[in-house]
UniProtKB/Swiss-Prot annotation:
GO molecular function, one term: DNA binding
Name of this chain's protein: Global transcriptional regulator CodY
Source organism per UniProt: Streptococcus sanguinis (strain SK36)
Family: Belongs to the CodY family.
Encoding gene per record: codY
Principal location class: cytoplasm
Keyword field: Cytoplasm, DNA-binding, Repressor, Transcription, Transcription regulation
Classification via Pfam families: CodY, HTH_CodY
Segments for region (GAF domain): 1-159
Xref: PANTHER family: GLOBAL TRANSCRIPTIONAL REGULATOR CODY, GTP-SENSING TRANSCRIPTIONAL PLEIOTROPIC REPRESSOR CODY
Length: 262
């Protein structure tokens, strides 16, 4: 019991992860490594769309094709759809099962391979799946307890992070709307023309050329850019005779300007 408690504490420490760690490319490499070390298995976490959030390969069980999924950080759509239909932990699935993590061409190499899938959901929201696998030995009850605890911990962390991201998006959209509302008719035309000059979210432009083309003064463009920059929506840098370098920091401004029909 003491051993199980200590293992549980190691897993729940994931709740102390910072927001910065959550924004890493693979934010759950740490917990998959902990699980793999504690349970002696391979482990990975995917979200409900199949994006890889973290993995750790303790044992070589897959071929180049499957390892490409880990490199690309995406799982096959068919597999993800099947995994999303798992509502309770499915333990010790054989290599003949549709949800086995072992690729079909390696079944002869790992005939006793076993896969366990634990759904990650909080408050009825499906957030992803925690998948662990071994070459031969079955996962015991203690292993499954730890897996379910881990899936719950990851679910809570993912939900909190998702809510924080939603709040950030709302604040960003509000900032864009408020900034655009301060623009005059001429400034709106200027911003629309400027955004149309960019290559994606950034680019180089010449204010005087744009001003002449749409029939406004250069000062209108300068004022419009200053308002957006002070709101944190764009950043700009003078390139001297070459014009101005502009980068959009909050892409929502494209849709907001488009809604104004400029």
């Amino acid at each position: 019991m003491a051993d199980l408690l200590e293992k549980t504490r190691k897993i729940t420490s994931i709740l102390k992860r910072s927001e910065e760690q959550m924004q890493e490319d693979l934010p759950y490499n740490a917990i998959t490594r902990q699980l793999a070390d504690i349970i002696h298995c391979n482990a990975c976490i995917i979200n409900s769309k199949g994006r890889l959030l973290g993995y750790f390969m303790r044992y070589k069980t897959n071929n180049d094709r499957v390892e490409a999924f880990f490199q690309d950080k995406n799982f096959p759509e068919e597999y993800v759809q099947e995994a999303n239909l798992v509502y309770e932990t499915e333990a010790n699935l054989p290599v003949t099962h549709d949800l086995t993590i072992f690729p079909v061409e390696t079944k002869d190499d790992f005939p006793d391979g076993l896969t366990t899938i634990a759904p990650i959901h909080v408050s009825g929201i499906r957030l992803g799946s925690l998948i662990i696998w071994r070459n031969d030995k079955e996962f015991a009850d203690d292993d499954l307890i730890l897996v379910e605890i881990a899936s719950t911990v990851v679910g809570i962390q993912l939900l909190n992070f998702q809510r924080e991201e939603d709040e950030k998006n709302i604040r960003r959209r509000t900032a864009v709307t408020m900034a655009v509302n301060t623009l005059s008719y001429s400034e709106l035309r200027a911003v629309s023309a400027i955004l149309g000059e960019l290559n994606g979210n950034e680019g180089q432009l010449t204010a005087s050329v744009i001003a002449d083309r749409i029939g406004i003064t250069r000062s209108v463009i300068v004022n419009a850019l200053r308002k957006l920059e002070s709101a944190g929506i764009i950043e700009s840098r003078s390139l001297g005779m070459k014009g101005t370098y502009l980068k959009v920091l909050i892409p929502d401004v494209f849709d907001e300007i488009k809604k104004r029909d400029y």
